[in-house]
């Protein structure tokens, strides 16, 4: 069912043609590469400067961490993205003992409203902040809603062109809630981001006293504070008294691939198709007519889909549109078929459907 090729190599030419971003294999090569990012830093908040402290750029996008409610006991009916980056920093004065802070309000929405353009902008700004020939910052922290946090975190991990640290952080309770988790999460995120021990680990997700690698991290519970996990791979560490404590020396995930998006101005549309018994995927032709350039199948088990869905996917693949087989199961690998002639789906390997989508867009 699956061709014996990696997702990273198989679809680059078919998705973006000659404009495809070039894959970079060795992390050491990334440090030497120059980044030509075009967007400017529109700083909306700057802390007083303290000599000797590192400099951190906080890019705020909204989400529950910036949410508010009329009741301190209400952790469900609240307005996400109602508090600005300056208020987030002001609520945690201990941040200024750790780092000089510049804040940028990239957006202020719930994470379900985050667009491809916002994610691409964050990627370009992170590279400009950290990876240029004369970087302005020592670390980047992105505040984000938890619903799609893993998508943005993974995109940053797959597009950051140096070994400096980006941390993505959110909260499960709004800022107005009793025992709001946002302030402590933000302090731990900044402390982790500026720590030299965090270098060379890729993009990290920090929530609820846990540090998780972005490639493997996923939201696993709709409500609980301890929601972000990497079931099979485990956490890489956890903050102790807000300072990061890592369980292992710095390393990168085995299946990590990094792509240079510095010259990419927009991301192609890629849709995720959820499989089930008697799934047909009848809507794929309409999606193609409306601009879809690729599809991810959130398959049953190890990437399975129904015979009726296969018929529709076979048609769009005949038009040169790539289809990636992933799985809606939380863990496991969608392996390539041993017989390349068995079909033309692309294996997602360890990537879940939403991360497969982001990688396909980046190729």
Give names to the regions the model predicted.
Residues 1-27:
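Fungal secretory targeting signals
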Residues 21, 44-48, 302-363:
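C-terminal non-catalytic interaction/assembly regions of soluble proteins
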Residues 25-129:
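ATP/NTP phosphate-donor binding region
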Residues 53, 59, 67-69, 84-95, ...:
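Accessory alpha-helical/coil subdomains and C-terminal extensions
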Residues 72-81, 148, 154-167, 182-188, ...:
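A glycine- and small-aliphatic-rich helix-loop capping segment at beta-alpha/alpha-beta transitions
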Residues 133-149, 290-302:
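Short acidic, glycine-rich surface-loop motifs adjacent to enzyme active sites
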Residues 142-164, 305-314:
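Short Gly/Thr/Asp-enriched flexible loops that form oxyanion-binding sites at enzyme active sites
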Residues 168-241:
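Internal gly/pro-rich beta-alpha loop/helix module
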């Amino acid at each position: 069912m699956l061709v014996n090729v990696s997702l990273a190599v198989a679809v680059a030419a078919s998705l973006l043609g000659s404009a495809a971003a070039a894959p970079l294999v060795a992390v050491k090569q990334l440090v030497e590469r120059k980044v030509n990012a075009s967007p400017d830093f529109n700083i909306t908040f700057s802390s007083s400067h303290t000599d000797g402290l590192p400099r951190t750029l906080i890019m705020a996008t909204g989400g529950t961490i910036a949410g508010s409610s009329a009741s301190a006991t209400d952790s469900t009916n609240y307005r996400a993205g109602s508090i600005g980056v300056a208020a987030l920093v002001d609520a945690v004065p201990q941040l200024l003992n750790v780092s000089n802070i510049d804040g940028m309000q990239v957006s202020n929405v719930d994470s379900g409203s985050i667009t491809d353009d916002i994610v691409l902008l964050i990627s370009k700004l992170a590279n400009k902040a950290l990876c240029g020939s004369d970087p302005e910052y020592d670390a980047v922290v992105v505040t984000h809603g938890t619903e799609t946090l893993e998508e943005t975190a993974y995109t940053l991990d797959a597009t950051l062109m140096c070994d400096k640290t980006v941390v993505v952080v959110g909260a499960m309770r709004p800022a107005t809630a009793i025992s709001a988790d946002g302030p402590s999460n933000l302090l731990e995120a900044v402390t982790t981001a500026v720590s030299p021990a965090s270098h060379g680990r890729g993009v990290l997700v920090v929530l609820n006293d846990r540090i998780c690698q972005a490639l493997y991290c996923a939201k696993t519970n709709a409500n609980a504070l301890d929601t972000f996990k990497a079931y099979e791979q485990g956490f890489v560490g956890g903050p102790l008294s807000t300072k990061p404590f890592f369980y292992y020396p710095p390393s990168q995930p085995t299946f990590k691939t990094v792509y240079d998006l510095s010259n990419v101005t927009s991301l192609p549309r890629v849709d995720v198709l959820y499989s089930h018994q008697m799934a047909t995927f009848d809507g794929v032709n309409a999606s193609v007519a409306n601009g879809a350039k690729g599809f991810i199948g959130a398959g049953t088990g190890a990437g399975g889909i129904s015979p009726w869905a296969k018929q529709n996917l076979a048609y769009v693949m005949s038009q040169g549109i790539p289809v990636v087989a992933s799985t809606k199961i939380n863990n496991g690998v969608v392996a390539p078929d041993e017989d390349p002639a068995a079909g033309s789906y692309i294996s997602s390997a360890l990537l879940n459907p939403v991360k497969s989508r982001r990688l396909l867009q980046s190729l």
